[in-house]
Design a protein with these regions (language model features):
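Periplasmic-binding protein-like
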Residues: 130-133, 148, 213-218, 224-225, ...
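A ligand-binding cleft/hinge motif common to bilobed small-molecule-binding domains
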Residues: 109-115, 236, 241-260
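Early extracytoplasmic/lumenal segment of secretory-pathway proteins
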Residues: 47-113
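A bilobed periplasmic-binding-protein/Venus flytrap-type ligand-binding module shared by bacterial periplasmic
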Residues: 151-158, 196-201, 273-286, 304-305
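Extracytoplasmic ligand-binding site segments that recognize negatively charged/polar headgroups
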Residues: 56-64, 100-239
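Short beta-strand->loop
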Residues: 120-129, 142-143, 169-172, 241-242, ...
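N-terminal secretory signal peptides that target proteins for export/translocation
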Residues: 1-21
C-alpha cells in the first residue's frame, strides 16, 4: 500500500509541474494583454477627442495650421471640411434632428441666416470681452475671429505680359477674357461679398443691386471662371490668373509660397468683412466644440490668424513686422463699411437675381 502511494505520488508530481508552468504562462500572457490594453486605453480615449467643424478647409485662411495647433494644445482632432458658408448652413438644416457638426465657420452675413434658421446656439468664449461690440452677436450666437478685405488676387506670371488690372472696369476689358475668376455668389459667402463690393463701388446699395448685376452681365461676355469653393491652388497654378478674393490669400501666396503675385484693392473701392464662428445647436461633442472656440480667440490662435495675414479680431495679436507686409493704409482706406445685418437680409434675393442674369 505504501509502495502504491509512493508510485502515485511519483507519477502525479510531473503533472503538477506541467500544470503550474501552464498556469504561470497563462497568467503572464494575461498580464501582458492587460498591460497592452492599459497602454492602448489612453490612446483610444484620445482618439475620441474630436470636434467636427463645417467650413474649415486647409487651403483657406490657413486653417491647416490652426487645426494642427488645436490638436497639439487641446488634444482635440478637427477634421478638415471643404464646404462653403452656404453649403454648411444647408447641411446644418438637413441635420437638425441629429446634428453632426459641433462648430461652424461662416462669413458674417451667413451667421445671421444660421441664427434665423435655429442651427446655432449661444456661447461666449474666452476673450469675449476683447471682441468689439459690432463684431459679435450680443447674445453669443456668433463672434468674429478675423476679417479680410476684398480685392484682386493676381498671378502676374499667368497674365501673359498684360498689365495688372487696377479697377473693376479693367476686368471687363477684352484683354482679360477668360482670366477672371470669382466664387459663386449664390452659394459661397466670399462670392457674395465680392458682389456687394463691386456693387457698392459702382454706386449701388444693398437696396439697389443694379450696378453690380450690370457689371456681372458685362463680365459674362468675358468668359469668367466660377468655382464653387476656394480656388487658391488654381490661382497658384495659373489656371485662374485673376481671382476676386481676400488680401490674406494673396499675401500668403507672396510671402509664404514665394509666388509672383500681387494683391490689388480696386480704385473704385471695396469692402472689408468679418468671418465668424458659432457653436452648433445640439452639438454632439459640445464640450470639445467650446474648447475649439476658446482656442481660436486665444493669444496663440489669434497670432496664427495674424501670421496667415488675416486681421485678427484682437488687433494686438498682429506684430508690426506682419502689419508691414500689408498694402499701405491709404489703399485700405478705399475699403468702405457695410451694414452686415442688411447684407444678410439681401443675400438670398441677390443670389436669385444673379442666377437669372448669368443663366
Amino acid at each position: 500500500m505504501i509502495r502504491s502511494s509512493t508510485r502515485f505520488a511519483s507519477s502525479i508530481k510531473p503533472l503538477w509541474h506541467r500544470l503550474a508552468r501552464t498556469a504561470a504562462t497563462a497568467l503572464s500572457a494575461g498580464m501582458i494583454v492587460t498591460a497592452a490594453l492599459a497602454a492602448l486605453a489612453p490612446q483610444a480615449a484620445h482618439a475620441d477627442e474630436t470636434a467636427i467643424c463645417y467650413n474649415c478647409p486647409p487651403e483657406w485662411a490657413d486653417w491647416a495650421s490652426q487645426i494642427k495647433a488645436i490638436q497639439q494644445k487641446t488634444g482635440i482632432r478637427v477634421p478638415f471640411d471643404n464646404k462653403n458658408s452656404g453649403q454648411s448652413i444647408a447641411q446644418l438644416m438637413a441635420e437638425q434632428k441629429s446634428p453632426v457638426a459641433d462648430v461652424v465657420y461662416l462669413g458674417v452675413s451667413s451667421a445671421f441666416q444660421a441664427k434665423d434658421k435655429g442651427v446655432i446656439q449661444t456661447y461666449k468664449p474666452a476673450h469675449w470681452d476683447d471682441i468689439p461690440a459690432n463684431m459679435k452677436d450680443p447674445q453669443g450666437y456668433w463672434f468674429t475671429i478675423h476679417s479680410g478685405t476684398l480685392g484682386f488676387f493676381v498671378n502676374k506670371d499667368a497674365l501673359e505680359g498684360k498689365p495688372v488690372p487696377r479697377s473693376w472696369a479693367d476686368l471687363l476689358k477684352p484683354e482679360y477674357k477668360g482670366m477672371t475668376g470669382y466664387l459663386d455668389p449664390s452659394s459661397a459667402f466670399v462670392g457674395y461679398a465680392g458682389a456687394v463690393a463691386v456693387n457698392q463701388a459702382l454706386g449701388g446699395t444693398l437696396d439697389n443691386f443694379e450696378p453690380g448685376l450690370d457689371w456681372f452681365r458685362k463680365l459674362k461676355a468675358n468668359a469668367p471662371i466660377v468655382p464653387k469653393q476656394t480656388a487658391y491652388a488654381r490661382v497658384m497654378s495659373g489656371e485662374i490668373p485673376i481671382l476676386l478674393d481676400y488680401d490674406f490669400d494673396a499675401y500668403r501666396a507672396k510671402y509664404k509660397d514665394h509666388a509672383n503675385v500681387e494683391f490689388v484693392i480696386p480704385k473704385e473701392g471695396t469692402i472689408s468683412v468679418p468671418y465668424v464662428m458659432s457653436l452648433v445647436k445640439g452639438a454632439p461633442h459640445e464640450a470639445n466644440g467650446k474648447k475649439v472656440l476658446d482656442f481660436v480667440l486665444s493669444d496663440e490662435g489669434q497670432k496664427l490668424w495674424a501670421d496667415a495675414y488675416l486681421r485678427p479680431v484682437r488687433a494686438d495679436a498682429m506684430s508690426p513686422e506682419t502689419a508691414a507686409k500689408f498694402l499701405p493704409a491709404s489703399d485700405y482706406a478705399r475699403a468702405k463699411p457695410v451694414d452686415f445685418g442688411k447684407m444678410a437680409e439681401k443675400q438670398s434675393s441677390f443670389g436669385e437675381r444673379y442666377l437669372q442674369v448669368m443663366h
